[in-house]
Amino acid sequence: MDLGELSVVLHGSPAQLDAAQPWIALQRRLTAPAARRYLVGWAGERELHVLAPRLLAQRASNVEGSLEMLMLAPSALLARHALARRHPGFPPPLGPLRLKRWMGAAWFVEGAAQWLSGQTRHVRPAVTRRLHEGRAPAFPPRPADALLLGGTVFDLLAREEGERAAVAATRDGPAQLLERGFPGRGLRHTEDAWRSHLSRLAEPGGPGGRAGRAGSRFS
């Protein structure tokens, strides 16, 4: 896919980032606390907006993987831009129809960007925190968990069916992934496998994610 020319805008504070795109403030309110520190930018049609590198580093917690996830945020935004080109209609810009579409498939668009960028390799500590906060996550993940847990669906697919299947799923869309991505079993059994996968990720020394590469695999 030809992504065309893109400008990258670095912001010197979260307030500047929010002022540039009101969608960010709304998405932050819709996101679970365990994932909010990783909401550091947005992908427009011709621009990527992200916090400056020093601010990304400052947002990292002292747990393993946090800094790596934040440093990969620009790659995730590039993947998010590519996904929006293939699956149009998600915010930004913000509008009623775009918001409705995002609410229904946030796990897919945010999770695919996370997996393609390589962030899923470093998500274990954040997943552990999420599993100890609040109710058990839904399957597929609700919007509040999309930024953190969406990538684990693609990670499970890559482990079971291979990376090519996971990359193909990013092209095909959310309905196709759930209906045909895991052949030979129903959605309920896929949910059970996903919950087991989350539990393994949350274990000390648990497996890291299998991550795609946004620049070379999304085409």
Locations of the language-model features?
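Surface-exposed patches in mature extracellular/periplasmic domains of secreted proteins
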Residues: 1-11, 84-85, 89-95, 126-129, ...
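Secretory-pathway/luminal and periplasmic proteins that interact with or process carbohydrate-rich
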Residues: 15-21, 122-125, 175-180
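Short intrinsically disordered coil segments
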Residues: 25-26, 65-68, 130
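Zinc-dependent metallopeptidase catalytic helix centered on the HExxH motif
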Residues: 33-123
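A short, charged helix-loop
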Residues: 127, 132-138
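Pan-zinc metallopeptidase signature
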Residues: 136-219
